[in-house]
Amino acid sequence: SDSHHHSYIRFKWALTEDKPVIKYYYEQLWAELPDAKTAPIQMSLNHLKAVHNKLVYFLKLLTEEQLNLSFIHPEHNNEVLLKQNIGIYAWHSNHHYAHIENLLKRKGWL
């Protein structure tokens, strides 16, 4: 859920700053932190649901002008329009949901 929270914040940065360079973070290292390793899975699922609910509500309110705002991704120094990032994020979310569903089935939690 941390990755999705970062994406939500990126949308907000693009609306409140002029082409901000987003903060890069090391996802693998975040995944090794104690909360990621030991917290009940339901906490992450609840966080993911809350972030997605907020993001969907937020995105529905954006104007065409706002959708053309952008941020700079530091990994490749690429400018990313918010309207492009919606598509990237949709793919990313579906990819993560498939992993989550597989884990839930594998662990017998679903």
What residues fall within each predicted segment?
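Short, contiguous alpha-helical
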Residues: 1-28, 56, 71-110
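Acidic/histidine-rich alpha-helical segments that form the ligand environment
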Residues: 10, 30-68, 89
